[in-house]
């Protein structure tokens, strides 16, 4: 059987990521080696480890790689559509596992707790994403989800969508969050108006709006901390 010179099988056995994982465990492998196992083989012009190294060089690390779009992945030499799909699926599976662990009895008592929950998903996004965090009567996280994607001035966030989800999840209270792709978290007039509309809806339905966070680059603004949740 002919072995593809750019597959993992072409490497000396002791250097193959798969065998190293078996002998030493997954924690002993570098990100490049983990990616090589996921990809399985390289291209006609590059080994699988070279393709994996190109991915890490292009995106700089796991966080940026997880946020990469299919189009961005396809720009890396050696990554075709099938491999891009493999990567997106594998990385999303890891993200879901991490998110599930976080959701297990996560208490939100301060704006920083809400920020830590969603910052990795929002602070590097080039689209404006509006999310809602739902809490139980004791302030523990029930779940959080995306309500809309796009500029708040272009994609209207209607209170009906926010509170429909709150009721569906049997939330006792909620926190809303969105990012500013510019990196500047200071609230705009549109942000202030939207918050007032949501506050009115929360009072009518008896589901308190605890906070509105705006996520910027390595920073955030909390409406509650800044006394912007006007009564």
UniProtKB/Swiss-Prot annotation:
CDD domains: MPN_DUF2466. A motif (JAMM motif) lies at residues 178-191. InterPro entries: MPN, RadC_JAB, RuvA_2-like, UPF0758, UPF0758_CS, UPF0758_N. Keywords: Hydrolase, Metal-binding, Metalloprotease, Protease, Zinc. Pfam families: RadC, UPF0758_N. Residues 107-229 form the MPN domain. One of its GO terms (biological process) is proteolysis. Zn(2+) binds at residues 178, 180, 191. GO terms for molecular function: metal ion binding; metallopeptidase activity. Belongs to the UPF0758 family. This is UPF0758 protein pc1765.
